[in-house]
UniProtKB/Swiss-Prot annotation:
Post-translational modifications: Phosphorylated on some or all of the serine and threonine residues present in the C-terminal region.
Function, as annotated: Photoreceptor required for image-forming vision at low light intensity. While most salt water fish species use retinal as chromophore, most freshwater fish use 3-dehydroretinal, or a mixture of retinal and 3-dehydroretinal. Light-induced isomerization of 11-cis to all-trans retinal triggers a conformational change that activates signaling via G-proteins. Subsequent receptor phosphorylation mediates displacement of the bound G-protein alpha subunit by arrestin and terminates signaling.
Disulfide bonds listed in the record: 110-187
Extracellular side of membrane: 1-36, 97-110, 174-202, 275-286
Record bears the keyword Nuclease: no
Taxonomic source organism: Scyliorhinus canicula
Keyword field contains Transmembrane helix: yes
Alphabetic keyword roster: Cell projection, Chromophore, Disulfide bond, G-protein coupled receptor, Glycoprotein, Lipoprotein, Membrane, Palmitate, Phosphoprotein, Photoreceptor protein, Receptor, Retinal protein, Sensory transduction, Transducer, Transmembrane, Transmembrane helix, Vision
Protein name listed in UniProt: Rhodopsin
Residues with lipid group (S-palmitoyl cysteine): 322-323
Regions of this protein lying in the Cytoplasmic compartment: 62-73, 134-152, 225-252, 309-354
Post-translational modification N6-(retinylidene)lysine, affected residues: 296
């Protein structure tokens, strides 16, 4: 055994020398130099001061501008809400624990932070599933008379929360557990031990199958079919140029969101799966710390992608910030831009069925 397991923790270091201590009671500077903990604290501070404004602005701008309240935009707003849950529910505690060198909030605080981190990540993943299904239905048209409306959007939002809770809540009630990971300054699902007392092995398998593999399979299937359909439609000119351009813009934005999600979360999932499949193997604390903290950047990239790639939302945001005026919008292109970006809205209600 190359680690030390306690009642509520697992530290990736053997206690042969007797230096290993509980991450809830003592600084963990034997795992890494103090300056590395300071770097983690500074990183979390950056995510807080950068992530809160852009996610809050996403919500505020959509509330202020009625034309942004399109059905599928509700899913994008759902991502912003999930990001804010992560920012308020986990980031401050992670920053404070990194500053102190150990998890000062105890096992209860670890459960609290682990729950919100898992909940936010899963809402993000299942939101991308809903977006992928919407793109598939709208562009590929397997159901010719289907129109994505507000009711479908609310159902999609509800699905994301139900599935996220089905993943984040069980460790709080005895199926698996949340423990400090890596340098012991942030908490997540216990991938490190089998822990038969809480049936940890079955939960981790359930999580990887139901809450990671299946969602990604759905996403890849939808976009695989979508790419083929877009190419066929372009070749046959089945849609107007304006409609094709609008659908391409929306699809491109959502695909980039999926790629960004994979960049942020795939390293974490891969390392966690490796650790789980190699119980007791030797690995350093940095091995899990880097992907775990890198995954937290997910709270920042989604709103940035949305702002940068959705011209209608970007114009509304600039108008809100500039107190009702958009100094960057040319007068002669106002009419054309408005019609184009309105068509680019992530709402299938504006796309005529075949």
């Amino acid at each position: 055994m190359n680690g030390t397991e306690g009642e509520n923790f697992y530290i990736p270091m053997s206690n042969k020398t007797g230096v290993v201590r509980s991450p809830f009671d003592y600084p963990q500077y034997y795992l890494a130099e103090p300056w590395k903990f300071s770097v983690l604290a500074a990183y979390m501070f950056f995510l807080i001061i950068a992530g809160f404004p852009v996610n809050f602005l996403t919500l505020y701008v959509t509330i202020q501008h009625k034309k942004l309240r399109q059905p599928l935009n509700y899913i994008l707003l759902n991502l912003a809400v999930a990001d804010l849950f992560m920012i308020f529910g986990g980031f401050p505690s992670t920053m404070i624990t990194s500053m102190n060198g150990y998890f000062v909030f105890g096992p209860s605080g670890c459960n609290f932070e682990g729950f919100f981190a898992t909940l936010g990540g899963e809402i993000g993943l299942w939101s991308l599933v809903v977006l992928a299904i919407e793109r598939y239905v709208v562009v590929c048209k397997p159901m010719s008379n289907f129109r994505f409306g507000s009711q479908h959007a609310f159902m999609g939002v509800g699905l994301t929360w139900i599935m996220a809770m089905a993943c984040a809540f069980p460790p709080l009630v005895g199926w698996s557990r949340y423990i400090p990971e890596g340098m012991q300054c942030s908490c997540g699902i216990d991938y490190y031990t089998l822990k038969p007392e809480v049936n940890n092995e079955s939960f981790v398998i359930y999580m990887f199958v139901v809450h990671f593999s299946i969602p990604l399979t759905i996403i890849f299937f939808c976009y695989g079919r979508l790419v083929c359909t877009v190419k066929e439609a372009a070749a046959q000119q089945q849609e107007s140029e304006t409609t094709q351009r609008a659908e391409r813009e929306v699809t491109r934005m959502v695909i980039i969101m999926v790629i960004a999600f994979l960049i942020c979360w795939l390293p974490y999932a891969s390392v966690a799966f490796f650790i789980f499949c190699n119980q007791g193997s030797e690995f350093g604390p940095i091995f899990m710390t880097i992907p775990a903290f890198f995954a937290k950047a997910a709270s920042l990239y989604n709103p940035l992608i949305y702002i940068l790639m959705n011209k209608q939302f970007r114009n509304c945001m600039i108008t809100t910030i500039c107190c009702g005026k958009n100094p960057f919008e040319e007068e002669e292109s106002t009419s054309a831009s408005a019609s184009k970006t309105e068509a680019s809205s992530v709402s299938s209600s504006q796309v005529a069925p075949a």
